[in-house]
Amino acid sequence: MALVVVPDPDALLLIRRAERPGDPWSGQMGLPGGRSSPADAGLLETAIRETREEVGISLLREELVGQLDDVAPRSPHLPPLMVRPFLFVLSRRPIVIPNSEVAEHLWVDWVSLVHPESYRPHTIRLGETVREFPAYHVSPIPVWGMTERILAPLVELLAAD
């Protein structure tokens, strides 16, 4: 998984996943990234390859700032997997060329993410159950779930500045 950050203004790339039958994250906001391939040398290579495939951005190792904590789904209804997010800071905003897995993309400025009013519950109906999840309301579709959990520590650090 790649967090792609650009300056002027400081912004983060978010994608909305395409609607696909059987995909539990279908239609949700997220970050570029996906399954590792046997050809990948490691999860960093997976993040670089998947970002290139999904949004047409060729990330360079020199743009890698660091690795965030691994995140896994908390629901027993989701596939057992582990996501390792890598933070890349680019010198300028690249052209985004989404593939068929990406319905749309947007650049969200950090000011919006750290604004206290953007972080509030998102209500989801799961069958007969209604649940609330923490979410960033910075796009037409709230950013919640694993993506929210990836972003939260970073947003906390930025808000502390």
Regions found by a protein language model. Give the residues of each.
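Buried hydrophobic packing segments
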Residues: 2-5, 147, 151-154
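Gly/Ser/Thr-rich beta-alpha loop segments that engage phosphate groups in nucleotides
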Residues: 29-36, 147
